[in-house]
Every structure is written in structure tokens, then in C-alpha cells.
């Protein structure tokens, strides 16, 4: 049974503490890359003592008759990357990764996360926590762990604004089978513990994203959405996902680091357009851009309006109330305000689908910004090699990241970074989403692997590039692993497939060469990329997530191609290009279908001294040479007055023999 209740004031209670535990299968049943649960890093990640926070949380749970409390990572809009004020899971657990769910019972606490963060979580969680390594055989999901903790008719609570309605229903149904129940706690318990130390909610001003970059007026996008509503016979669409609102209205914001979005909701009906946003965020220019047809309402009033819309829904031909359409990412709180499933149709958002197919203006912008970004990366790697090898300079990982940002910022249309730069040397490169911090990060070792995953936000597009270099002499294993990863990148880059194929179906192409050696990587092969929007964009992707099988790739999709390989405590390798799906000509057209392939837009050299050429086929060797010739042609013009970078680029793009 699903219902909403209000939380009670904070009380105090004693917490139980136990050593950090791992749910992990025997070594033989998963990739040896992560066989050792002990984390061997050359830096010390900070571990936060969460004992007192858990004491306070359990007091609140007791006061509200809760036996288990769930703390997801997401905010009220189900954002992957969140504002600091919404980092509740990080606050309660000490784990800073972008993905994971914390579950706290009266006697235990668990944190579930995916393979990108196994090492990081193991280092950051203190002894109060059990780490659930998601996706490994024999490891319970956070839902299963919650159900175990709630056995015997216990009550589980969650803030309904930070969990989707679909997830809440599914968990509730599972709990009810054992006599337990899920309830919504409207006032977030972690917020009460955080108190006045919780960061303020951002309220940054919104800017217009002009048609010269957007490629389509927002009025046309709304007209297209209304056609969808007519086809589906729905009363309106409730928009709660932030990048969908930014894209729909051709606006950009700055409320979440690295993601140009702003806190808002929207309701689109056949006759009206309501934008729920704090008025002070809108300049006169933005209000003029929106025009008189867009009614601006206070951000928080969406919930009261939802109830009114539900009660006054238009009628169908048979006299029954029409349903509203909303994304399957909409929060449980929003769903409850509308009256739940009876009043709402939850589905993959048509805005998400439309946003993922870039128009020609957006595609041109993505090509252009990647050329500028590629030039910035070449300048950085040339500088870094010179500093390490010729000048014998001592540079740490943050020094490198800061220098790269400085170089990027010189380029036209640069707005900021698209995510925290992953500047990692040696064993730190094996931490997939590693974040160096000044004072505790490592000095870059010229005799070890250096992995740099970085990206920029430009007015005309978003970039995301990973390159792995070795400025000394790589080992035989490092060269073999790098080359197998490169072969996987080429396999996806050169794939030709019938229209209607999903990224789920293509994932094995990038892994096949590693698989032949019994190797693999525990992250997806590719994710969608926004156009001056979120660097991680759905609904498309290449990987084993089941949702990737539910949507096929289409011309205009922009995704990453980023296979990798990681040896815990030794090194990590990843090569990442951004590729765009497009129609291609084939000698035959079986079934009269259209056939698709990819165009790569990333223009940065691939570390040649890590390539074991004997492992490449002639076609793969030619691909590398053609790619490097293209990089030289498109970026060398930036270095007419920069002899250092020009010479480095010439060296790194010379043909393989």
C-alpha cells in the first residue's frame, strides 16, 4: 500500500557499528581485474566517520516507526549529477560517487553501487557499512537487501521525491509479499540531520540557447510534442527531467555543476504551456524569449497544480477522464500528487527520444566543438610530455587537470567543463571514476600509464574524450591490453547494422577482443551525449543495461565509444571517442531496410607507443592511420605559432608501419 506521511522531529539514539563488509562472489566467478576486494591506491581517499549521522538517522527512523530507510543518489528530478544540496546519499554514507543507493536499518547499513565505483566505495565507506557490488553473481541488489532487512512485517520509508513511482511500486509489491510495507516520508530525514550545514539550493539565472546552436525554435518542439499527445490521446505531458526542460525551451542554466540545467517543471497541454520555475531566475530577455504563450509559475506550485489538473482532466469520447503522460523517471511524489497510475501514464519520454536525435545544426556544432576540443587536448598532452620528460618537472594529477582546463578555456565558445576531469596516473587509473584532490593526489609518474578522461561544455556542443598515454616504456601486458581495447573501439566505430538495432546488441563488438583473452571491463561501452547539455544523456547507450535493448539507434544519435581494461593496483586503460549514428550505403539492402554506421568526431591522437602492431589486422592498422591523418588535417592549423605542440602532433599522428 502506497501512501504519504510527514516526518517527525529529530531525536537521539545509539547506533551499532561493524567492520566494512563486502558481498562478493569467489574470485573464479568474476573478472580478475576486481578479484581483490582490498583497494590498492597510491593516494588516500578520505573516509568519513558516519557513526554520529547514523545515530541521528536511526533516532528519526524510530520516531517515525520506520525499521528501514532508503537514501537514493538522485534528486527530485532523478538527475544523475546533482546539486551539492541534494547529495544526501554522500552525506549519510561518505561515498562520493555519482551512482549508488544507501539503505539503513536499525542494526545495519549497506551501500550498493556499480563496477565503476567498487574501488572508490571500498576506500571511502567506514566500518558502519556493507558494500554491495552491483551486478556480481551472489551479491544482493539494494532492493533484495532491503527486503531481507524488512522481513517480518517491518516498515520501510523513503522520501517520495527522490525515487521514481515505478521503483516505489515494484519495491512495495515485493515487500507486501512478506507482510512488510513501503511508505513515503515527505520531509527528508537526511535533510533534518544535515540541518543548517546543508548547502543552499542554487538559484542561478537562466540563459537563452539561441537557434544558431539549437537548430529549431522551441515553439516547433512544443508543436511536435502536442502531436504526440494527440496521437496518444493524452490530456498533457508533465515534464520533470531537467535536461528535457532545458532542451524543450531552448534555455540553459547553471544549477548543477557541469550540467547546464535549471530547477523547473513544465506542463504541456494542447492549449497551454506552464513553466514552473522561480521567477528571479528569468531575465527580461528570457521572458521575452518565452513570450506570452508560456505561463511562468512558482517552482513548488507544481504539486498543487497537479492535483487540480487531475481533478479537472478533460474527458474522452466515452466520458472517462483523459490521462496525463509523464516520464517513467517522474518521482513518486509527483505521481501521488496526480493520483497515481489511474491518472498518469508513465512511459519513456517523447522529449527524451527527440532530444537524442540531433538536428543538422546540432550535429555540425558537435563536429566543430570536438575539433577545437581535440586541439586543446593535443596542446595539453604535448605540454605534459615536455614537462615530464624534458624539463623533469614534478606535477601532480590536479596540476594536470587544471592546466587542461586552462587550455580549453582559451577556445571559442567554451563555457566550462562537462564533468570533473579524471587525471590519473599508475594504479589510480584503475579507479574508473577517479577524482584527484589537491594535497592527497599522486604525482604523475612518467614511467606509468596516464589516463585522462575529460570534457568541455561549448555553446555548440558537449565533448567527452579519454586518452591513455605512457611517456616512458610500457610493459608487454600494458601494450597488449591497450591494443585489445583499441581493437574494440575500432570494431564499434566501423560497425554497420540495420536500422532498428539497439546499443545492447552492439556492446559485444567492443568487448570481443578482450573476451578472447578472458578479459573484460565492468562499465558500459557507451552513453548518449547531449548538445551543450548533460554529458550522459538517455535513453540510448551501448552496454548490457536492459533499457538499452528497448530503444534502437537512429541517425543523429550521438554516443561515446569507450571500451577499457583495468588491473586493480596496477594500471587502467580506456580509449574514448564520440561517434554519431548516420545512414550508410551498402551493396545490398536486405529487407529494404536502411543501414546505419558511425562517424567519429573526436580529434585527438591515440598513444602510439602503447599499440602492439602485431595484434592489429591490416584493416585496423589502416583505420589508425586514416584516423590520425584526419586528426592532423583538422587540428594542426591551430598550432602554426606553437612549435612544441605541432611537433608532438606530427609525431603522434605519423603512420603505423
From Swiss-Prot:
Cofactor binding notes: Binds 2 manganese ions per subunit.
Cystines in this chain: none
Binding site for Mn(2+) 2: 453, 464, 576
Keywords on record: Aminopeptidase, Hydrolase, Manganese, Metal-binding, Metalloprotease, Protease
Enzyme Commission number(s): 3.4.11.9
GO biological process: proteolysis
Reactions catalysed, as given in the entry: Release of any N-terminal amino acid, including proline, that is linked to proline, even from a dipeptide or tripeptide
Main enzyme class: hydrolase
InterPro entries, alphabetized: Creatin/AminoP/Spt16_N, Creatinase/aminopeptidase-like, Creatinase_N, Pept_M24, Pept_M24B, Peptidase_M24_C, X-Pro_aminopeptidase_P
One GO MF term attached to the UniProt entry: metal ion binding
Cellular component annotations (GO), alphabetically ordered: cytoplasm
Any matching Pfam family: Creatinase_N
Cofactor entry: Mn(2+)
Binding site for Mn(2+) 1: 464, 562, 576
Record's function text: Catalyzes the removal of a penultimate prolyl residue from the N-termini of peptides.
Family as reported in the entry's similarity comment: Belongs to the peptidase M24B family.
PANTHER family: XAA-PRO AMINOPEPTIDASE 1
Protein name, per record: Probable Xaa-Pro aminopeptidase P
Gene: ampp
